[in-house]
Amino acid sequence: MERYDELKKGESGALVSIAAYLVLSAIKLIIGYLFHSEALTADGLNNTTDIIASVAVLIGLRISQKPPDEDHPYGHFRAETIASLIASFIMMVVGLQVLFSAGESIFSAKQETPDMIAAWTAAGGAVLMLIVYRYNKRLAKKVKSQALLAAAADNKSDAFVSIGTFIGIVAAQFHLAWIDTVTAFVIGLLICKTAWDIFKESSHSLTDGFDIKDISAYKQTIEKISGVSRLKDIKARYLGSTVHVDVVVEVSADLNITESHDIANEIERRMKEEHAIDYSHVHMEPLEQK
């Protein structure tokens, strides 16, 4: 039940993000429209996609807390990943829309210099998102949630987007109104890049992709355990933010069942202690004599 308790605690991070994005997106879109800032409007649209992404994380965390059943013997942990994948599609659509609008403005003869209130709005948004980022990063490490850690990274990128918006609007005050539009275009690219990164990571996880470097680290741990004659096979995959490892090891044929079972327990203990892996399935085979 410990993992489910951690997922429950992680909900607060998603809720904080949702609240922050609701406030920021409304303020930025209104001020961006009233004071003629393409960059701030794009920043506000970016925050609306973040609302969707944060809601997806929240839904994923809640579904992931459902215990295993007949249809889902491994639990519902992948709900986090599926929700993130859906959010990436929505973010990509909004990012492309921002690029399209910015592109039209670049080739338009009508370009207005945004008011400085738009710049200060962007600066305030950057400060708020840095605070939310630090909160979610600490919480993500505490509850060991990759989805929440990704949300924290998104918070951080949003802070930098707002800083870029601030710089673009300030530069536009020096009779360079086109800089505000160019900044909006760059923000559109950043939204698309974030969407692609989330899609790439989520699809990699859903297709049972895994980091080879982590597999190598697991191998080193298991091969050092007393009683393990040979590590025959090892596979790992993500189920949401949890790692499941399947191990096949060869042990001396002279060992009895109890001794072999003790080795399996030691493998599970070391994997949890050194790599924070709670789910290890160990299969024992007698050492093949060559």
UniProtKB/Swiss-Prot annotation:
SS bonds (residue pairs): none
Induction: Transcriptionally activated by MntR in response to manganese excess. Expressed at a basal level in the absence of MntR.
Gene Ontology CC: membrane; plasma membrane
Gene Ontology MF term list: monoatomic cation transmembrane transporter activity
Coiled coil: none
Swiss-Prot/TrEMBL keywords: Cell membrane, Ion transport, Membrane, Transmembrane, Transmembrane helix, Transport
Membrane disposition: Multi-pass membrane protein
InterPro entries referenced in this protein's UniProt entry, alphabetically: Cation_efflux, Cation_efflux_CTD, Cation_efflux_CTD_sf, Cation_efflux_TMD_sf, CDF_Transporter
Disruption phenotype: Deletion of the gene has no significant effet. However, a mneP-mneS double mutant is manganese sensitive and accumulates high levels of intracellular manganese.
Highest taxon of the lineage: Bacteria
Stretches that traverse the bilayer: 15-35, 39-61, 82-102, 113-133, 159-179, 181-201
Family (UniProt): Belongs to the cation diffusion facilitator (CDF) transporter (TC 2.A.4) family.
Function according to Swiss-Prot or TrEMBL: Secondary manganese efflux system. May prevent manganese intoxication.
Name of protein: Manganese efflux system protein MneS
